[in-house]
Amino acid sequence: MPHALGLTLAVLLLGLATSLAGPFMSLFAVQQVGMTPLQLGLFLTFNALSAVLVSTRLGRWADRRSDRKPLVLLTLAAGVLAYLALSGVRSVYGVMATGVLLLAVSSAAFPQVFAFARSGFAQAPGDLPEKAVTVLRAVFSFAWVVGPGVGAAVLGRWSFSGVFLLAALCYALAGLPLLFIRPPAPAPAQPNSAPSPLTQELGAPPAPPMGWVVAAFTLYGMAMHMGMVMFSLFVTETLHGTSAQVGFLVGLCALLEIPVMLLFVLSKRLPGVEWLIKAGLLLFVVHFALIYLAQGMPLLIATQVLRAAVLAVMAGLGMTYFQQLMPGRFSAATTLYSNTSVVGSMLSGIVAGAWAQVFGYRPVFLLCAALSLAAWGMMLWATRRPKLA
């Protein structure tokens, strides 16, 4: 695979940059900047909306260019500038402006780097491009296993300024290997080439309507983020567990997610991506139902094994699925996939908070199960095949 090592290093450093600072952004806004809960909500909402708008625009622009690298480097440079600014700015409006103007652009680094990698792998034979992207997604997940712990250690010793300076350094280093990667030459037309094993299922016309697919992934994103936000509160407040137990369960899920992703790469024969995604959504329904029923650690451990399998499918293959549905538009496809998670996250905070306020923490997971079931139904409807006469 061309430039695989350089791209792997860039993805690892990008993952470290986002995972070092991301988990502590709300804490920084409240403790260091002095934002009120309303200001924090506005800050996070404006950031998310700006990120969706900017990344969508950049994704469309990138697909019209023969060389995507300048845009990739632009998003990484925005990350450097954003975290350099946050290491010194302590005014509410200054931090908000940094978020809307710089963090929004840096959020496009994830889809742009992966689109750049996918376009570079485009001429590899068979299903190697899809498998290579899955490996890179596993590397990004590994960075999120390591990054928050490193960020917490840096925060304890050098405060928020140290965390943000380290994140800026990771953004800068992520761009270095990309400087030495030449843009891929246009792929020659191969009308008689056979489809790869990962794309065989998508060969049957018509292609699923993107509106239904996007809606399904957005509902999945809502369920995923709602479950993630409320899980620690459910364990500690409802089941009277400890923060150490929460850390163990979350860490177990993150660790198991990576080998499951790599299993997709190493397996010789796989069901179609479409089938795996629908199966993953059904498995998510079971995952949330079991959390709702859980009374202690044994069942909670089982739920995290299921969650790891679901996240491996949806994160590892979801991006590939969008790229298959939008052939030749790698930036737009990857950006659209990424934006479903951003929008789902934005909606999840409001809905989860209101639901927990009225019904308590445990029923939140029934709502997550319902959202996952609705997402599965949408995917089932979107991918239905016309019956032959």
From Swiss-Prot:
Origin superkingdom: Bacteria
Family, similarity comment: Belongs to the major facilitator superfamily. Set transporter family.
Major subcellular site: membrane
Gene Ontology terms for molecular function: transmembrane transporter activity
GO biological process: transmembrane transport
Keywords, alphabetical: Cell membrane, Membrane, Sugar transport, Transmembrane, Transmembrane helix, Transport
TM region positions: 10-30, 34-54, 69-89, 96-116, 135-155, 161-181, 211-231, 246-266, 281-301, 308-328, 341-361, 363-383
Record-given protein name: Putative sugar efflux transporter DR_1322
This protein's record includes keyword Cytoplasm: no
Upper taxonomic lineage: Bacteria, Thermotogati, Deinococcota, Deinococci, Deinococcales
UniProt-listed InterPro entries: MFS (IPR011701), MFS_dom (IPR020846), MFS_trans_sf (IPR036259)
Compartments, as annotated in UniProt: Cell membrane
